[in-house]
Amino acid sequence: MSRYSPKEFAQQIGSGLLSFPITHFKASDLSFDEAAYRANLSWLFSHEAAGLFAAGGTGEFFSLTAAETDRVVRAAVAETAGKIPVIAPAGRGTAESIEYCKAAEAAGADGILLLPPYLTEASADGVAAHVEQVCKSTKLGVIVYNRANQVLDENHLERLADRCPNLVGFKDGVGDLELMTRIYARLGDRFTYVGGLPTAETFALPYLTMGVTTYSSAIFNFVPKFALEFYAAVRAFDNAKVYKMLNEFVLPYIQLRNRKRGYAVSIVKAGMKVIGRDAGPVRAPLTDLTDAEIAELSALVSRVAEVEKLAA
């Protein structure tokens, strides 16, 4: 059972940086390596985060079976031991999303990230109906992820918020500033707003002015102190420091990430390897970084080694 009401869940996730951990796979057979995953979560918890997305996009939800997803979520719940909320994924079709929600409740998760339906183009009315059915199937607080083929405007979101009191979060992966402005202007503090564009640090400062107080940080996986320092600078509107850190690490990191489609996940696992916390390979259809690219990433990480004190 969740320790948070939907309202409490929303308040908690909006209070700080959100962790987006990768899922560990064994190199021998690509099976879930639960022991390594839990050990890594224990290390991550030594750094302050407001919530944890288990088996999310960076956690390769798209390549996990329902049974594997349940194992990952249960491992996260067990390892966190109530210290921070665990946000479980739901996605694919409506019926499957509902089953994911039921499994998340049974596992003791604290909230749901509702990912877009798989390979389905639908009208906004259809997407809204999907979201409503999923929200009404669970008592947990739900964050709807606006991206790809699941894009809702302020009118649909307002109706959903009226009908579904547990729809308490909005994660933006679209990057349409006009739409984001309209949504926040209409709904205000009815939602907690989460930045969800790839390498969310890039957009964190302008998004903060539109009510987006937090984001899921993939780089928190391997440069957690840098990620937290960056987040603190954003929240303080320390523009000079934010842009210094963008130039020092984030923007060169994005250039490397953009080398190939799918590297948004692969580069995070490469980062783990660079700091000596190998999480295994990515699953197909993703591909791992080349040795040369890993060397480039290692040189980049060394720029912030003083902040990280990686040897400590």
Swiss-Prot record:
Give one GO biological process term: D-glucarate catabolic process
Q: In which pathway does it act?
A: Carbohydrate acid metabolism; D-glucarate degradation; 2,5-dioxopentanoate from D-glucarate: step 2/2
Catalysed reactions, as listed in the record: 5-dehydro-4-deoxy-D-glucarate + H(+) = 2,5-dioxopentanoate + CO2 + H2O
Record key words, sorted: Lyase
Q: Name one Pfam family in it.
A: DHDPS
Task: Tell me yes or no: is Nucleus among this UniProt entry's keywords.
Answer: no
* Gene3D superfamilies on file: Aldolase class I
Alphabetized GO MF terms: 4-hydroxy-tetrahydrodipicolinate synthase activity; 5-dehydro-4-deoxyglucarate dehydratase activity
Q: Which residues form the signal peptide?
A: none
> According to the UniProt record, what class of enzyme is this?
lyase
What does the record give as EC number? Answer: 4.2.1.41
Which family would the database say this protein is a member of? Belongs to the DapA family.
For this entry, the protein name equals: Probable 5-dehydro-4-deoxyglucarate dehydratase
Instruction: Give the organism, scientific name.
Output: Ralstonia pickettii (strain 12J)
